[in-house]
Amino acid sequence: MVLVLCDASHGVAACTSFGTPTKLPISLPLNLPILDQFRPPSCKWCSGNRGIEYRTVPGSVVFAAASGIVTFVGSVAGTNYVVIKTNETLKTGNNLLVTHGRLRSVSVKSGDLIAADQTIGGAGESLYIGVRENGQYTDPQQCASLGSTGKPRAVLVAG
């Protein structure tokens, strides 16, 4: 059993286990340029970037960054999102959510069981990936790990 401790100042969690960074089963698209890094807000309602935004080729296939169950599919302020409650939640009891945003199209629905690498939609001009653990935002790059092959599991390909 792994105990994950989070520094929840300003609604931002740090993935640590007894002070050591903890890698979670989340894979990020290592083949895409980052447009906007994670920038924690200075207060709960302040501006910042609660995830990472990647440059994409519009229409590219978007694969799930984690395995789990889809808990939300919809448009927020004109932007399509897919939220996955990861299988890690069952293992640790921590509520770990991965948000995929700025999607042009979505090919899953709420309640679907998703495997890492499964197609969840098509990319827009960019792709947003955010991570929340027990309601606290955390830097996806601090928590992401590679698959057992050492290769990224979430990649985009021209569709």
Question: Where in this protein do the model-derived segments appear?
Answer:
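Solvent-exposed coil/turn segments that connect beta secondary-structure elements
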Residues: 39, 59, 67, 75, ...
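Zn2+-dependent peptidoglycan hydrolase active-site motif and core
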Residues: 65-105, 125-131
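Short glycine/threonine/proline-enriched tight-turn/helix- or strand-capping micro-motif at secondary-structure
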Residues: 32-65
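Short, solvent-exposed loop/turn positions at domain surfaces
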Residues: 56-58, 102, 108
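Acidic, glycine-rich catalytic/binding loops that coordinate metals and/or anionic ligands
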Residues: 15-29, 48, 55, 109-115, ...
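C-terminal segment of classical bacterial N-terminal signal peptides
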Residues: 2-10
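Short, well-structured beta-strand-loop connectors
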Residues: 61-70, 107-123
